[in-house]
Amino acid sequence: MVDSDGFRPNVGIIVANDDGRVLWARRAGEDAWQFPQGGVEANETPLEALYRELREEVGLGPADVAVLGATRRWLRYRLPRRMIRRRGSRCIGQKQIWFLLRLLADEQRVRVDRVARPEFDRWRWVDYWYPVEEVIFFKRQVYRQALQELSGYLQADDWAGTGTEGGPAAVIPPAARRRLR
């Protein structure tokens, strides 16, 4: 699904541990590392896509994490020209709602091999700002924007708690709860 401007709706997923370090995953068969992310399907909310992609890409379910926050609006990046497909619907980039999650489960629950064709083949914990300089160049600005906007949730007083005080709706902006058509 591509919107009228040529951007594919997508969710970006930042999973943080108790030390505030974030899950960084290597794309299968490549020397490219990134946060988990994935497309939002028709008639699905970004929040629903978050949980589906979380299960598919790193093997975690809703009980394994707490949603700490989400970006207030869609963040966009453009693909380099050489990566734009010439056939089918013309996708020029991605628009993403980013979620910051706290890992509640033991880190051994993180599994990148739970699907037939895994997106990732390795993962590790890195410092919060590390991904900004290490992700592929065309995603850097969006990573910087998402990490900046969500960084306050790591410094919140409830970090030692579950992060779910008030329930998910308390930290999920309307854009992340709207069903895509």
From Swiss-Prot:
Residue span(s) of domain Nudix hydrolase: 6-148
Q: What is its EC number?
A: 3.6.1.-
Q: One Pfam family for this entry, by name?
A: NUDIX
Query: GO MF annotations for this entry?
Result: pyrophosphatase activity
The residue numbers the entry assigns to motif Nudix box are 38-59
Q: What does the UniProt function comment say about this protein?
A: Accelerates the degradation of transcripts by removing pyrophosphate from the 5'-end of triphosphorylated RNA, leading to a more labile monophosphorylated state that can stimulate subsequent ribonuclease cleavage.
* The protein's name in its UniProt record: RNA pyrophosphohydrolase
The organism is: Halorhodospira halophila (strain DSM 244 / SL1) (Ectothiorhodospira halophila (strain DSM 244 / SL1))
Q: What gene does this protein come from?
A: rppH
